[in-house]
Amino acid sequence: MAQLSSQGNNAIIYLSYAFMLATGLFLAWKFSSNKDFLSSNGTQRGIPLALNFVASAMGVGIITTYAQIANIAGLHGLLVYTICGAIPIVGFAVVGPVIRRKCPDGFILTEWVRHRFGMVTALYLSAFTCLTMFLFMVGELSAIRSAIETLTGLNALGAVIVECVVTTIYTFFGGFRVSFITDNFQGVCVLLLLIICAAGMGSYIEIDTSKIGPSGLLKANKLGWQLVYILFVAIVTNDCFMSGFWLRTFASKTDKDLWIGTSIAAFVTFAICTLIGTTGFLAVWSGDLIVGDENGYDAFFILLSKMPRWLVAFVLIFCIVLSTCTFDSLQSAMVSTISNDVFRNKLHINYVRIMLILIMVPIVVLAVKVADNILQIYLIADLVSAAIIPSVFLGLADTWFWYLRGFDVMAGGLGALLGVFIFGTVYYHSAREGGKLLLIWNGLYDSSDWGPFGAFVIAPVGGVIITLASAALRIAVLYAYSKVTGKEFTALDKPVTVEVENQDHTYGSIDDDESDTKKVV
């Protein structure tokens, strides 16, 4: 690697963090208020939303995860990953207005769940939501640590701690409003990084065209087809756990702005992740790696080693900016979720800020001590979301599933995770391996191992089946109880909901006809 001196690297790292701190504090002083600390509903137009969704969908981890899949499953696997990562962003424009019709004063998914299924179910979903964001924060710190150490050869512990301190300080004062603005900055940085790195790689990397055909990286493959299902289910459901996406969905001024923002973001995310991922097979064609190389996740940095030092320094700066903005978004989203779901936004803003500081301690410890496999961290969160989210979303269709209650949803989600364990135990003939499957211990990229595929089938399908079975059993028990006691049977009564309209939106069910919805001013 064409590295700078340790003094030069340290200067770049800590001056970059100082710049981000100064920028964040200035934005907090200029734009923040207690009103916007947790959310900014109905304030944002399409283009700022697009930049925010792009930034929320990315972190430094994209540099390694997409290159790794490209090195293993070639163009087929890479396109599957990037398409599956982009399409769910548009899903917020589809589902977001429906959620807002039902819960116009909320700003995250769990608030609608509280209205539909009750407090206990909302806390259940909130716990898994916070767990997901916790894992993503650990993954992001692990990713920036790996990036800094690879680019500089330095121990990145100090940089990781400084990043946490920097984002905590300006998020402490600015909250969601500052996070939203820094995400716009991050979106621009990602585009600049892409343009400069693409130009650099085009100038300094030599491709041996004789290796392209024999590598087989441009052909369809079994793993690529397996990932079509696995990654789509994993990413669609996991995005629903990311409160940062919901905060931005509710921040849209109109549904049209939401459609514009998510559509642009989906396309840009697809393009950026695809181009970054191509380093996985470019490194093979340049002779630096082999197909399925154990260092495939480092393909971007391996190619970067062929470039001049100024370009390495540039990439280091933008990795820091990218990670800092991603991390502050996760911080803001987690604090907003806890404040809303646990304390009902009644906690004094200073206590919310203290909570922001406290959650950093375990995250830093885990990121430094135990988080080595970034992709596996994400996959654990993906499997949990695949088990829980489908049964929750049945509650959007009141015409068909009005009889579902919170108990059914919780039984479905937890039962699905138990089902994955049972499947793994049977498939691998070992309870130990069944437990490992819950953690996706063996990864996704072994096409001969159908365990992960089965897990991502059992999780959503099993969750829905168990939810419906739980509802049927509960209704049957209540019916028998009403017959025995003579009490009124109400288990199949449709819940009465108040339809509310906010701004130019109509709020109701996913299957409501607009002509039947009453406008309330």
UniProtKB/Swiss-Prot annotation:
PROSITE patterns membership: NA_SOLUT_SYMP_3 (PS50283)
GO MF annotation list: spermidine transmembrane transporter activity
Reaction it catalyzes: spermidine(in) = spermidine(out)
UniProt keyword terms in alphabetical order: Glycoprotein, Membrane, Transmembrane, Transmembrane helix, Transport
Deleted gene: phenotype: Decreases spermidine uptake. Does not affect significantly salivary gland-secreted histatin 5 (Hst 5) mediated killing.
Subcellular location: Membrane
GO biological process: cellular response to metal ion; cellular response to starvation; filamentous growth; filamentous growth of a population of unicellular organisms; filamentous growth of a population of unicellular organisms in response to biotic stimulus; filamentous growth of a population of unicellular organisms in response to starvation; intracellular pH elevation; spermidine transport
Primary subcellular site in the record, as a coarse category: membrane
Domain of life: Eukaryota
Topology with respect to the bilayer: Multi-pass membrane protein
Membrane-crossing segments per the record: 11-31, 47-67, 79-99, 117-137, 156-176, 187-207, 227-247, 264-284, 310-330, 354-374, 377-397, 406-426, 453-473
GO cellular component, one term: plasma membrane
Positions glycosylated per UniProt: N41
Pfam families assigned: SSF
Disulfide bonds: none
Record's keyword annotation contains Glycoprotein: yes
Protein family (similarity comment): Belongs to the sodium:solute symporter (SSF) (TC 2.A.21) family.
Purpose of the protein: Spermidine transporter that is also used by salivary gland-secreted histatin 5 (Hst 5) to enter into candidal cells. A major component of host nonimmune defense systems is salivary histatins, a family of small (3-4 kDa), histidine-rich, cationic proteins secreted by major salivary glands in humans and higher primates. Hst 5 is the most potent of the 12 histatin family members and has fungicidal activity against blastoconidial and filamentous forms of Candida albicans. DUR31 only functions under high concentrations of Hst 5. Hst 5 cojugates to spermidine to be uptaken by DUR31.
Name of the molecule in the record: Spermidine transporter DUR31
Record organism: Candida albicans (strain SC5314 / ATCC MYA-2876)
Name of the gene encoding the protein in the UniProt record: DUR31
